[in-house]
Amino acid sequence: MGRVIFHIDLNAFYASCEELRHPEYKGKPLAIGSKDRRSVLSTANYEARKKGVHSAMPVYQALSLCPELILIEGDFNYYRALSARFFSCLKKYTFKIEPASIDECYMDVTEIIKQYKRPLDLAFQIQQSVLNETGLSVSIGVAPNRFLAKMASDMRKPAGITVLRISELETKLWPLDISLMYGIGKKTVPELKKIGIQTIGDFASAENETKILQLMKNSGYALIQKARGHSSSQLHYSYTQKSCSVSKTYSSNIYTLKEAFDKVKELSIELSNRLKKDNQKGKLISISLRDLNFHTIVRSQSLNQYTNQPQIIYEIATNLIESNFESNGYRYMALTMASLQNANQIVDQISFLLFL
C-alpha cells in the first residue's frame, strides 16, 4: 500500500470565523479588510465570491461589484485561537501533520487509515470532529501525494471530500483549466495560454514539454512532473506541540456564571495537567462556548509570561467568560493554550538573561 495523504483546508477561514461570532452575517456577502477604500481584502466568503469579490482585491473595486458587502477588520488573535483549536483536533488522530498555513495542512494517514473499514470514513470523521469542536467546515483532498491532495481539496468547496487517484488524472485533473493548477502563478497563465497550454492535461503532455521548459526554465520541470502525478509524499512534520485543548459537551445546559465558572475550573485543572505531563507552558489562552443554537463564541487573551498553572488559566478564562457571557444556555465549552514552549527551555532562557 502506498502513502495516503490528506490535505485539509478550512473553508474561507477568516470570514468563517467572523460568521461564527456574528451568525446574523451568514448567507450575506462578507469580506475581511480595512474600510479604507484604498486597501485590499484579506479574504471573502463564498457569497461575496459569487459576486466576483476575491482576496487581494481593492476595497473600492469590491464595493463597486457588491455594494452590500459587509467589511470587517481582521482580529488575528481570534483567528489564531481558532486555528490552534483546529490543529489540536487533528492531533487527536496523528502528529504526522505539516502545517501549510494558519488554515490548512497536510496529514499522513497511511497507518491510521488501516483502522477503518472504508478509507473515507476517516475523512468524514475528521470533518465532523473539526466542525463539532470549532464550528468551522473543512474540505479534504485524499491522494497518494501532496500535490494531488492539494488539488483534490480544491475540487469541492466548501465542506467537500475528494479522492484523486493516479488512475483518475485523465478524467479529474487534466481537463481543468491551467489557471487552477497549484504552483502556476497568475502572471504565467497568460504566457502559457499564448503557447497553447489551456489545460493541466496540456501542461502534462510530453509533446508540449520542450516549449514549456523554454518558457519556464528550471521551474517548469518539477511542475510538469506534478501534473503527471509524480510528487513527494514526504511530509515535514514536527512532534512539537503548538497548542493543547480540552473540551466537554454537557448533558445539562449552563445558564449561570456560577455554573460556567465551576465547569471552567474543571477544564483548567485538566488543561494544566496535560500541559505539565507534556512539560509545556503557553502564552495564549482561549475559551469557546457554544449555545443551543450552535452559535459559538471564542475569546482569547495573550499573557506576558508562559504558564501551565491551573489558577492562572482559571483566572484568565473566567475573565473572558464574564465579559462575554449570555444566559442562552451553553452545552459545549473548550479551553485552549497556544504559543507553547518546552518548560525547560523557558527556565534556560530566564537563567541566561539573569546571567547577562
Q: Language-model segments: which ranges?
A:
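Extracellular/lumenal ectodomain signal focusing on beta-strand-rich modules
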Residues: 104, 332-334
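DNA-contacting surface of Y-family translesion DNA polymerases
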Residues: 7, 180, 188-332, 339-355
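Gly/Gly-Pro- and Ser/Thr-rich, intrinsically disordered tail segments characteristic of DNA damage-repair
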Residues: 1-214, 220-221, 343-345, 351-356
